[in-house]
Amino acid sequence: MIAYDKIRPAIVRGLADYLGVQIIRGNQSAEAPRYPYGTYNITTIAGANNGTRQQHADGIDRLMVRSIWSFSFLSADYDESIILAVKAREWFEHTGRNWLAEHGVVAQSTTDITNRDNILTVEYERKNGFDVVFYVYDEVQNLAETNGYIEGADITPERTN
C-alpha cells in the first residue's frame, strides 16, 4: 500500500511553509480560502510499473511506482499567480528535495508551467500551474514463511556412457 496518509501531509506542509500560502486539495465543494493559495489534485495515484518488488530485510516488499500530482496557484493578481507557480516548481526541482527525501518522496520530474485561468461570472481567477511526477513506494508485508536456514544436500553427478 502507498502511504498517502503520510506522503500527502509532508508534501503539502513543506510546500506551504516554503511559499507562505495555504495549499488545499482541489475540486472540493467547501468555500475556497482567501487569495493567494495553491491547490493540488492527485491525477494518477499509482502508475503502472512492470518491474518486480524488492524484498527487504525488514519483511516489507517494495515496488517503486509513479504518482502524478497537479498543482495550481490562484490569485486575483496575474503576476502573483505566476510567481507562486515558479517558486513552487523550483521547490520541487531543487530547494525541497531534501525535505521530500526525508519523507520518502522523490520528485522525479515537473512539467511546463501553464495558464489555467478561470472566468468567475464577471472577473477572472488567475491560475497557473504544473504537474509533478513523484516516485513513491507501494509496500506490502512479505508473508512468505521462512525458517531461518537453507537445507543443503550433497549432489553427485552421474556419468553416462
Predicted features, each with a name:
Residues 61-79, 125-136:
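Oligomerization/assembly interface segments of phage tail-like spikes and tubes
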Residues 24, 41, 72, 108, ...:
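Residues in well-ordered beta-strands of folded domains
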Residues 91-141:
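Acidic-leaning, charged glycine-interspersed low-complexity segments
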Residues 37-39, 69, 105, 130:
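A broad, low-specificity signal marking well-ordered, structured residues that form hydrophobic/aromatic
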Residues 1-59, 147-161:
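Small/polar-rich, solvent-exposed N-terminal microdomains that initiate assembly or binding
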Residues 84-90, 148:
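Short amphipathic alpha-helices in soluble, non-transmembrane regions
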Residues 2-6, 75, 79-82:
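Soluble non-cytosolic domains of exported or imported proteins
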Residues 48, 79, 138-142:
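Residue-level signal for secondary-structure boundary sites
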